[in-house]
């Protein structure tokens, strides 16, 4: 069953065509070289698996090797695998013993990876309830923090009370810092050194770098007492030496009292920026910070005037290494600076501090709750050359690609992460890396071991007889030749290294540039496009011309650069069919008799002919009409006149036959109307020589001649009749009009009433007119007499 599943796995890998070609074309000559091509490649160590010259064929996908005949037990194909060494279950609920708490699973494993391959791990993280907390309060005691010092005198009691609601195992400690006590950071006169505040006047302590005052303890009253006894100090410039203090608080694990199984919180309180890196060169301090603990017997930083300030990178390394979570509690003016620092430091948070630190308790509680609501992974160790990618699976199974952080988690919730590890190249050494949650001591230890070797390399036949009289060592199915020998079986000596016999011509490259010359013979390269062959590798089966993207039009085989067409095809591209079926028109004539069939398509030769079978030809007369002149001449002529019709028929390309016994197969029946309106019918046939013959000429349905006298009589009578009818109509219209006028006259005469005294037709001879131009004058009466 196991072998069957393994075979199925190999077959699955082999389904990718692109991958298959990559293995065989990689040019691998050894098993190790084959494995380096990619995780999909395998090597066949079986003896005589291929022709001795075909070493490259041993490297292929497992499926292809099986298909070529390689036995399964000879296939070298190491696969990536995960070996879990330690996988304790995650803790649930409260644990009495903090050493029994497990917050990450698994805890240890070995990862064996093929170069180029990837393996995905599942990592689970759960923050346990009631987890111990160590809080170290690191305070800036420069003169500007005097009011803050007074505010926190009872902080220990109040902080312990609030933290007891979140954990039953809480400890706190105290330390302070100011600045490096060297010029130009402080004044160096004896008075200023003894009392940096003498100019105020006010007494304060001499400037110091860092003092560890109270180790971590659960005695809150002791914390209050220590804070009450603190006095401020002073320096000149605004930035402080806080990063020196952070470094010492992080690395002095024994002095501070950090526990292994607890949450380490470092509360950094200041109202100013901090020096870092090469700022100390202003004071002539040039020795880089070594990241080690330098607290003397008085718990003071003894190398403050010797070592440079730590860089941000050094702080990150030591904070992560010692699982210290940094809480910046700074004033409004400094928030933006420390937010930039926090973006670089894993697990760091920033809180806004009031001028007198009045909100420090709420700030610490809020920062603690924020830290406990987040789960973020960090990677430590030798990761150079490794490719790691993360996918976070947070609340309700929500996926976050390329993220290794879950937010808004509750204590007791489980955050899962998919971690994909990839080695792009083969390495001879193993890698030890650590994947851990930020701020927690729990970690996953991961040993990454490259799988670059083949098992068959362990079995070596030195000076093997399989390698031509012991000229090499036989390993993994191939020979590794001794110096001075070469060839698949080490059969070639230095005297056989000439490549002249591998050249087709003296000026040609060896093996046409497409093969290797072994012992005077060409071993052609493999190609993803096909086979390369020939004594000089001069031939192949893929360099022929293409038609419509297909080699030899898909109708032939490519042989040494030339197309060999299959039956029924011809032409340079094998794209020309010899079949004429597609050229036959509906009447069964090839290209309708108007063209030639070329490569299965009609090429019309008659002017004006077109169509797939040249069936359309507006300028080509039909076969019947083209014979009209011949037929009409034959019917109308008699005796010697018929001889004249022979010439007309020759022009029409036809001959008239009087034979009645002829084959009507393939004949064309024609009907024409002659000049005498008679219907002429005849048949057109073609003899064996392709000549047109006209048979069975008949003239029928001739119309009778017209009766001209009767036509003339009819026309005359019709004209006479039309004239009589028109006269009658005119007479009727005139009579009707006269009667109407007489009736009208009679009606008007009956209505007339004449007066006896005056003739209505009489008009007087005198008319009176008024002069319209006369004004303001005596009225005159002008009588004008006008003759009517």
Curated annotation (Swiss-Prot):
It is found in: Cell membrane; Cell junction, Focal adhesion. Residues 22-709 are extracellular. One of its GO terms (biological process) is cell adhesion. It comes from the Eukaryota. Disulfide bonds join 23-41, 31-454, 34-59, 44-70, 197-204, 252-293, 394-406, 426-452, 456-476, 467-479, 481-490, 492-519, 502-517, 511-522, 524-537, 539-560, 544-558, 552-563, 565-574, 576-599, 583-597, 591-602, 604-614, 617-620, 624-670, 630-649, 633-645, 678-702. Residues 22-71 form the PSI domain. Keywords: Amelogenesis imperfecta, Calcium, Cell adhesion, Cell junction, Cell membrane, Disease variant, Disulfide bond, EGF-like domain, Glycoprotein, Host cell receptor for virus entry, Host-virus interaction, Integrin, Magnesium, Membrane, Metal-binding, Receptor, Repeat, Signal, Transmembrane, Transmembrane helix. Residues 131-371 form the VWFA domain. Residues 1-21 form the signal peptide. Glycans are attached at residues 48, 97, 260, 387, 396, 463, 471, 541, 575. The chain crosses the membrane at residues 710-730. One of its GO terms (molecular function) is molecular function activator activity. Heterodimer of an alpha and a beta subunit. Interacts with FLNB. Interacts with HAX1. ITGAV:ITGB6 interacts with FBN1. ITGAV:ITGB6 interacts with TGFB1. The VWFA domain (or beta I domain) contains three cation-binding sites: the ligand-associated metal ion-binding site (LIMBS or SyMBS), the metal ion-dependent adhesion site (MIDAS), and the adjacent MIDAS site (ADMIDAS). This domain is also part of the ligand-binding site. Belongs to the integrin beta chain family. PANTHER family: INTEGRIN BETA SUBUNIT, INTEGRIN BETA-6. This is Integrin beta-6. The lineage of its organism: Eukaryota, Metazoa, Chordata, Craniata, Vertebrata. The gene is ITGB6.
């Amino acid at each position: 069953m196991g072998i069957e599943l393994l075979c199925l796995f190999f077959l699955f890998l082999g389904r990718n065509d692109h991958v298959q070609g990559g293995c065989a074309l990689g040019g691998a000559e050894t098993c190790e070289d084959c494995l380096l091509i990619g995780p999909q490649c395998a090597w066949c160590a079986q003896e005589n698996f291929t022709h001795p010259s075909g070493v490259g064929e041993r490297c292929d996908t497992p499926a292809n090797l099986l298909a070529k005949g390689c036995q399964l037990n000879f296939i070298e194909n190491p696969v990536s695998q995960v070996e879990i060494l330690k996988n304790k279950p995650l803790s649930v609920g409260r644990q009495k013993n903090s050493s029994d708490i497990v917050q990450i699973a698994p805890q240890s494993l070995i990862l064996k990876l093929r170069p180029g391959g990837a393996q995905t791990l599942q990592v689970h993280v759960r923050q346990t309830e009631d987890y111990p907390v160590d809080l170290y309060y690191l305070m800036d005691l420069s003169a500007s923090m005097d009011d803050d010092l007074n505010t926190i005198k009872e902080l220990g009691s109040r902080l312990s009370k609030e933290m007891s609601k979140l954990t039953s195992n809480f400890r706190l400690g105290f330390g302070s810092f100011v600045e490096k006590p060297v010029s130009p950071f402080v004044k160096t006169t004896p008075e200023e050194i003894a009392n940096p505040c003498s100019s105020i006047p006010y007494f304060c302590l001499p400037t110091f770098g860092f003092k560890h005052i109270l180790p971590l303890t659960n005695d809150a009253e002791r914390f209050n007492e220590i804070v009450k006894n603190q006095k401020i100090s002073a320096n000149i410039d605004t930035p402080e030496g806080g990063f020196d203090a952070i470094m010492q608080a992080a690395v002095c694990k024994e002095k501070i009292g950090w526990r292994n199984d607890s949450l380490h919180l470092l509360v950094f309180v200041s109202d100013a920026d901090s020096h870092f890196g090469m700022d100390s060169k202003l004071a002539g301090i040039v020795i880089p910070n070594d990241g080690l603990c330098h607290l003397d017997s008085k718990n003071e930083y003894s190398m403050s005037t010797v070592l440079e300030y730590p860089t941000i990178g050094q702080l990150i390394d030591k904070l992560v290494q010692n699982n210290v979570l940094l809480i910046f509690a700074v004033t409004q003016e400094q928030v933006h600076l420390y937010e930039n620092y926090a973006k670089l430091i894993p697990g760091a948070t920033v809180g806004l501090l009031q001028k007198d630190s009045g909100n420090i308790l709420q700030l610490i509680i809020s920062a603690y709750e924020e830290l406990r609501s987040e789960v973020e992974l960090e990677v430590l160790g030798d990761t150079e050359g490794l490719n790691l990618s993360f996918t976070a699976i947070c609340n309700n199974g929500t996926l976050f690609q390329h993220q290794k952080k879950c937010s808004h988690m509750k204590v007791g919730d489980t955050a899962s992460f998919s971690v994909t590890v990839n080695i792009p190249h083969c390495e001879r050494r193993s890698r030890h890396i650590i994947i851990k949650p930020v701020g927690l001591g729990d970690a996953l230890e991961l040993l990454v071991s490259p799988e670059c070797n083949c098992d068959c390399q362990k079995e070596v036949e030195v000076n093997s007889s399989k390698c031509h009289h012991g000229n090499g060592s036989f390993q993994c199915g191939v020979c590794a030749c001794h110096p001075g020998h070469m060839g698949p079986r080490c059969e070639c000596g230095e005297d056989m290294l000439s490549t002249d016999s591998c050249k087709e011509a003296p000026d040609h490259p060896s093996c046409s540039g497409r093969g290797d010359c072994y012992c005077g013979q060409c071993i052609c390269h493999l190609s993803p496009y096909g086979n390369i062959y020939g004594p000089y590798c001069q031939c192949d089966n893929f360099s022929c011309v293409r038609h419509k993207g297909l080699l030899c039009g898909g109708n032939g085989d490519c042989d040494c650069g030339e197309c060999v067409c299959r039956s029924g095809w011809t032409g340079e591209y094998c794209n020309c069919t010899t079949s004429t079926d597609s050229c036959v028109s509906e009447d069964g004539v090839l290209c309708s008799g108007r063209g030639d069939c070329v490569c299965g398509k009609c090429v019309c030769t008659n002017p004006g002919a077109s169509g797939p079978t040249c069936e359309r030809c507006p300028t080509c007369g039909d076969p019947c009409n083209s014979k009209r002149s011949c037929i009409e001449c034959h019917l109308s002529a008699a005796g010697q006149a018929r001889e004249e019709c022979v010439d007309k028929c020759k022009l029409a390309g036809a001959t008239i036959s009087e034979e009645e016994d002829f084959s009507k197969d393939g004949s064309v029946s024609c009907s024409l109307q002659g000049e005498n309106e008679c219907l002429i019918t005849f048949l057109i046939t073609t003899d064996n020589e392709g000549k047109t013959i006209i048979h069975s000429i008949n003239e029928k349905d001739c119309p009778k001649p017209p009766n001209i006298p009767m036509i003339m009589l009819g026309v005359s009578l019709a004209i006479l009749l039309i004239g009589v009818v028109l006269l009658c109509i005119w007479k009727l219209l005139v009579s009707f009009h006269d009667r109407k006028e007489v009736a009208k006259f009679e009606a008007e005469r009956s209505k007339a009433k004449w007066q006896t005294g005056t003739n209505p037709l009489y008009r007087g001879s005198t008319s009176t007119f008024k002069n319209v131009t006369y004004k303001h004058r005596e009225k005159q009466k002008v009588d004008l007499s006008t003759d009517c």
